[in-house]
Each structure stands twice: as C-alpha cells, then as structure tokens.
C-alpha cells in the first residue's frame, strides 16, 4: 500500500482557545502519523521565527496546509510574518529559490460570516476566490501547486454535527491529499 505524502499543517490562530471550529478540525488530524501539526502561535508567541527550522520543515513535507481564520480579509499577523520571512528569496522564489517547487499548498480557513456575504454586491463585496488570490499568487511565486481551499463559513455558528462533518471530510482528504478533492 502506498504511503500518503508527508503533510505539514501550519496552524495559525491567535485565540485558539476560543475557536471551537478549529479545535474540532484539528483534533482528529492529530492522530494521522503522516501529518505534522505545527501551531505557530504556540511556537512563536514573541513572533521571533526560527527561519531555518521552518524552511527545513517545508523541505521535509510534500503538502503544506495553512489552517487559520480569515482576519481582515487575510491571515493572522504571525502567519503573514511567517510567509514574508520563511518564503524568502533564494529559498522559495527568485534566483535559486526552488525549494518548494512541485509541492502542494492548501488553505483551510474559518470565517465569521456566511458564505453569501462573500460575493460581488454582498457585505464583503468580493467572492472568497478574490479575497484568497494573494495566497494563490504566493503559492505560484513559490512554484507550488494550488489546491482549492476548504472554507468553513460562519464557523462559530455551525452546529456541532456540521463541524464534525467538516472534520471528517478534512481527515479523509488528509489521508490521501493528492488524489482527493473537496
């Protein structure tokens, strides 16, 4: 039987203790041997990122999952700092920057709004695909394959059984991330 590719799950939530949805998503994932869950806020509460360590983690994994809440139409501050520092020129992009070539990027995002608010003319003015375009472009800049994101809309208001269903789908995808869509 083929082994699944190694997955690095970069989790970034500054108030993780208050996020029921993210806890429900993460709990079953931690049982998967081929998945490394790396909580950025737990590792770097002072925002001093060990760039070489993070780059080695990226080298050691084939699939990179960025799990975070949508904050101000982007990601939490520490993840933005991580992206800017770790995906450095010469490592992930630019001259000689091919360390991530051929790897896969997937964003797993929780939002505080309903799906219908993310559309042209809606409360948030733009569809989620447009809001996430900077992440897709970053993946492309790093020569990575973009996998369609998993988005849990209105996360804090989801029923427990709905969150459990999302968590089950997440685990199923992680068990075979390069052959399953979501």
Curated annotation (Swiss-Prot):
NCBIfam families the UniProt entry points to: PRK04930.1
Pfam families: Flavodoxin_2
Bridged cysteine pairs (disulfide): none
Function field: Regulatory subunit of a potassium efflux system that confers protection against electrophiles. Required for full activity of KefB.
Protein origin, superkingdom: Bacteria
GO molecular-function terms, A-Z: electron transfer activity; FMN binding; NADH:ubiquinone reductase (non-electrogenic) activity; NADPH dehydrogenase (quinone) activity
Record-level GO cellular component terms: plasma membrane
A GO biological-process term: potassium ion transport
Family: Belongs to the NAD(P)H dehydrogenase (quinone) family. KefG subfamily.
Enzyme class, spelled out: oxidoreductase
The reaction(s) this protein catalyses: a quinone + NADH + H(+) = a quinol + NAD(+); a quinone + NADPH + H(+) = a quinol + NADP(+)
Entry's localization field: Cell inner membrane
Name of the protein: Glutathione-regulated potassium-efflux system ancillary protein KefG
Phylogenetic placement of the source organism: Bacteria, Pseudomonadati, Pseudomonadota, Gammaproteobacteria, Enterobacterales
Annotated membrane topology: Peripheral membrane protein
Principal subcellular localisation of the protein: membrane
Gene: kefG
Keywords (A to Z) from UniProt: Cell inner membrane, Cell membrane, Membrane, NAD, Oxidoreductase
E.C. designation(s): 1.6.5.2
Keyword Nucleus: no
Quaternary data: Interacts with KefB.
